[in-house]
């Protein structure tokens, strides 16, 4: 059962950290994105917890705090270290909540390894710990991320040939990633479903662009595509 009181305390802690962050305050769009991403990951984590039998509250806490280190200025290695930094920031707060030490360590270990699967303290790669990173990864491939990625990469301003090459590169990457293990059966299923959707999307784009290329070729030869 979800403890609303503990979740609310975690939200207050996270908000306080983000509100005090110079970088996030100077870049409101980055702050809004980080908050939205955090809550999406928390919702995915809760779904994983319900289906895999994890403690809902602990999983939601872990997901809410997985990127809390964005309250700090990132140095040269800031991004690669942000999981480990988040774990260190979260640990004292989790102790204040009165959680058992073994549960604190499991939560912190999951947070620490969610970027590059490495921690700077002892821990186990339990299904619970792995699910923090799984929830984060699953969110990276939701439907809206397609729009965000295409917009960020300037897809609309590309020519047809560039778009075709772009889509093929994305397809190659998606096919490579789809069999990556996510730590639990539920996470594996969610991961494959999301990547399969994106694969279908990009395959349709490829067919459309290849069809346009064929149409242009026929036009140059004086043919009509209706013939």
Residue ranges, per PLM feature:
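Short alpha-helical hairpin
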Residues: 3-24, 37
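Inter-helical turn/loop segments and adjacent helix faces that build the functional surface
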Residues: 96-101, 151
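Divalent metal-dependent phosphate-bond-processing catalytic cores, especially two-metal-ion Mg2+/Mn2+ enzymes
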Residues: 1-5, 27-54, 65, 118-227
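Short coil-to-beta-strand
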Residues: 6-13, 54-63
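An active-site-proximal "capping" alpha-helix that borders the catalytic cofactor pocket
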Residues: 41, 81-96
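A short, mixed-charge helix-start or loop-turn motif at secondary-structure junctions
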Residues: 23-28, 71-72
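His-Asp-centered metal-binding catalytic motifs of divalent-metal-dependent phosphohydrolases/nucleases
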Residues: 56-78, 82, 86, 107-117
């Amino acid at each position: 059962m979800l403890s609303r009181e503990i979740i609310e305390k975690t939200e207050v802690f996270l908000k306080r950290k983000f509100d005090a962050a110079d970088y996030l305050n100077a870049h409101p769009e980055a702050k809004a994105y980080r908050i939205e991403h955090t809550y999406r990951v928390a919702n995915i984590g809760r779904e994983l917890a319900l289906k895999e039998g994890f403690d809902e509250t602990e999983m939601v806490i872990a997901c809410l705090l997985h990127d809390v280190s964005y309250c700090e200025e990132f140095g040269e290695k800031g991004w690669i270290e942000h999981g480990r930094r988040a774990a260190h920031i979260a640990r004292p707060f989790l102790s204040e909540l009165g959680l058992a030490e073994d549960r604190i360590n499991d939560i912190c270990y999951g947070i620490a390894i969610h970027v590059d699967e490495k921690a700077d303290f002892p821990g186990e790669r339990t299904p619970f710990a792995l699910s923090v990173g799984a929830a984060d990864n699953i969110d990276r491939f939701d439907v809206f991320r397609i729009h965000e990625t295409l917009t960020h990469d300037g897809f609309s301003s590309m020519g047809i040939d560039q778009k075709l090459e772009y889509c093929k590169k994305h397809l190659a990457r998606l096919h490579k990633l789809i069999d990556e293990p996510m730590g639990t059966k539920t996470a594996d299923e969610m991961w494959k479903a999301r990547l399969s959707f994106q694969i279908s999307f990009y395959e349709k784009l490829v067919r459309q662009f290849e069809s346009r290329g064929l149409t242009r070729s026929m036009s140059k030869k004086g043919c009509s595509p209706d013939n």
